[in-house]
Amino acid sequence: MNEGIHMKTAMKCVWMGVLLALAMPVFADDTQTTYCKIQGQLAETTLIGRYLGKSQTDAMQVVVRATDGMDDAFEQNIFIMLMGEIVDGVYERELMAEPEQHEAEFLAEARGLGKTVHDNCMQMDVKQVLKTMREGYHP
């Protein structure tokens, strides 16, 4: 059972890296659906990583590395800040006891968290949030 957890997690981590790398140009274009999908996927994979003993620092390093190719330093910092909020939220959650004995339950919890984060993101206007933040920093 543990091998199944590790294989699924490895695949999700690889997918998250690819997703974040592909999302950088899309994020710059303020695409709501893609950005919210990234947030949901980050929440899901971060929770799985946490169950497997990955540190919050490890999770943030994934976010920071994903922004390396961004041309706009402001957007890069905003991306790190917003995604950092997702990582922080995951590390504030209570974890179920003995997740290795409840693989299906903790994977369902991670998927549920990802869906909730995605749905909440879709209710906000990402484009307006970024515009407001940019105006606040560059009057």
Each PLM stretch: what is its role?
Residues 5-15:
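Bacterial N-terminal signal peptides that target proteins for export
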Residues 28-67:
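N-terminal secretory signal peptides
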Residues 61-139:
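Compact alpha-helical subdomains of small soluble proteins
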